[in-house]
Amino acid sequence: MSGKLFIILLLLVTPGEARKSFLRFLNIQNPEMLSFTKPEETVIVRSSYEGKRPHSSYLLVKLEDPTVLQVVNVTKTSLDFTDFTINLKTFPGETNLTMQLWESEGRQTRLIEEITNIRVSVFRQTEDSLFQEPIHVNSSVFLLVLLMILLNKCAFGCKIELQVLQTVWKRPLPILLGAVTQFFLMPFCGFLLSQILGLSKAQAFGFVMTCTCPGGGGGYLFALLLEGDVTLAILMACTSTSLALIMMPVNSYLYSCLLGLAGVFHVPVLKIVSTLLFILTPVSIGIVIKHRMPKKAVCLERVVQPLSLTLMLVGVYLAFRMGLVFLRMANLEVFLLGLLVPVLGFSFGYSFAKVYLLPLPVCKTVAIESGMLNSFLALAIIQLSFPQSKAYEASVAPFTVAMCSSCEMLLLLLVYKAKKRPLLSTENEKAPLV
């Protein structure tokens, strides 16, 4: 029965359709997406089609928007293969093009192959371009910073007590509060405030994506420096990054529809997964060291604070260096929203934790994890989601939030340490002399 069915299906397919289905003659480097930056560009398409007569095939290029692309000419060269060279004039914007391979047989023409919906993005690198002034980092320095980050995360793992970890899992209220704040309240507030302040669609989406990002690596650093619950901070960071696998695509789709930008974005799930693994792996190694080699764990715990401060300063320096270009595009409304986003996260997290009468270290941690967002993950999503001409405008949001949240946390840390010092000196004076 199956053999007869297969023969019937073959009889229903004409030879021309069979050739078109199973044979591909045109070869282009990236048939889904082409990116251009120069006023004049060249695309080479290779054809492996051998016609009945030599030089009988030709390439036809159809443009969806002639204000973005214009075909100057198409030249053909034939050696072992046939190469079609398409010379184009480009203008900033986005469009689609279609390539058709035709064969002429006397007065008749026959379509051999067609490639449709080739996405083309054209942008210009101006003096405000991110790549105009690249940051040159020596490979040895980069490797040193990477090793410091891994060592720092491993040292944080050494500070985790399994008993505390089990307690947190049995009472997951702080994690739930952080998740609700990060993935529901913050994106909505980012969307609402961006509409109130009248930001462009690209900037509004940039703020929404920044607000829906999970807590960044700086959360448990400040939890340590502000005497919060470090174990809870690390657990919240891991949990929120895991939830982001679902919530970031959902929020991306929802708010892009509300902004009228549906169908434009691609959320890099692998980037989120790699971030999660980057947090989990060295932290897990630190937990193992804590219980297998407690003496070495004590040594690692001693370097947590100085190493964390060093990495924080390096991060602030790099953020300012990279963000200066983006900040030239920022206006007063963008700066205002960049200042408000972290404050809202801190306020929501701390208020919810206080309402449920959680201990003070837990309240601090929930507030920090709700306000310290992984803005650079939002930047990566924007760079992959937008055409380059719009990516710079949208990237203003995560850089502004990253720098504002870092400055606000540093200011809070200085105030906290300044208030704590008189209290310590007063306690020392009251202590009885032996």
UniProtKB/Swiss-Prot annotation:
One of its GO terms (molecular function) is bile acid:sodium symporter activity. It is found in: Membrane. Gene3D superfamilies: 1.20.1530.20. Keywords: Glycoprotein, Ion transport, Membrane, Signal, Sodium, Sodium transport, Symport, Transmembrane, Transmembrane helix, Transport. Residues 151-172, 217-232, 290-306, 353-365, 417-434 are cytoplasmic. The chain crosses the membrane at residues 130-150, 173-193, 196-216, 233-255, 269-289, 307-327, 332-352, 366-386, 396-416. GO terms for cellular component: membrane. Its main location: membrane. This is Sodium/bile acid cotransporter 5. It comes from Rattus norvegicus. The gene is Slc10a5.
